[in-house]
Curated annotation (Swiss-Prot):
PROSITE patterns: PII_GLNB_CTER, PII_GLNB_DOM. The lineage of its organism: Archaea, Methanobacteriati, Methanobacteriota, Archaeoglobi, Archaeoglobales. Homotrimer. Interacts and forms a complex with Amt1. GO terms for biological process: regulation of nitrogen utilization. It comes from Archaeoglobus fulgidus (strain ATCC 49558 / DSM 4304 / JCM 9628 / NBRC 100126 / VC-16). This is Nitrogen regulatory protein GlnK1.
C-alpha cells in the first residue's frame, strides 16, 4: 500500500468586507502594508440598517434603497484573520451609518487553476 506524504493542514478563512467605495484605496493600502496583497474586489449594491437614503434630485425627492458598495474578499490562514479584520476596520471606518460589514467564512479547500494543486 502506497503512503501519501503528509501535509500540514492549515485552517483557512475568507474575510469578506462590504465597504464604502471611496474607502477601497485606504483598505488596499492598509492590507498591503501588513503583507496581504491578494484580494478580490467587486462593485456591489446593498443595504443594511440604514435601509437606503433619500436624495433631492432636480427638485424632487428620490429614494435610493440599494446603495453602491465595494466587496473585498481576502483568503488568509486562521491566525491572520484578526490582523486582516483590524486593518479593514481601521482604514474603512468613518463612524457613520453605511460603513459596512465584515464576515469571516471557513474555506474548505483551494485549487490553483493553472496547476490543479489543492490546498486543504
Amino acid at each position: 500500500m502506497r503512503r501519501l506524504p503528509t501535509r500540514e493542514v492549515v485552517e483557512m478563512k475568507m474575510v469578506v468586507a462590504v465597504i464604502r467605495p471611496e474607502k477601497l484605496e485606504c483598505v488596499k493600502k492598509a492590507l498591503e502594508e501588513r503583507g496581504f496583497v491578494g484580494m478580490t474586489v467587486t462593485e456591489v449594491k446593498g443595504r443594511g440598517e440604514q435601509k437606503g437614503i433619500r436624495l433631492q434630485f432636480r427638485g424632487r425627492e428620490v429614494e435610493v434603497d440599494l446603495l453602491q458598495k465595494t466587496k473585498v474578499e481576502v483568503v488568509v490562514s486562521d491566525d491572520a484573520v484578526d490582523e486582516v479584520v483590524e486593518a479593514i476596520v481601521s482604514s474603512a471606518r468613518t463612524g457613520k451609518f453605511g460603513d459596512g460589514r465584515i464576515f469571516v467564512i471557513p474555506v474548505e479547500k483551494s485549487v490553483k487553476i493553472r496547476t490543479g494543486e489543492e490546498e486543504v
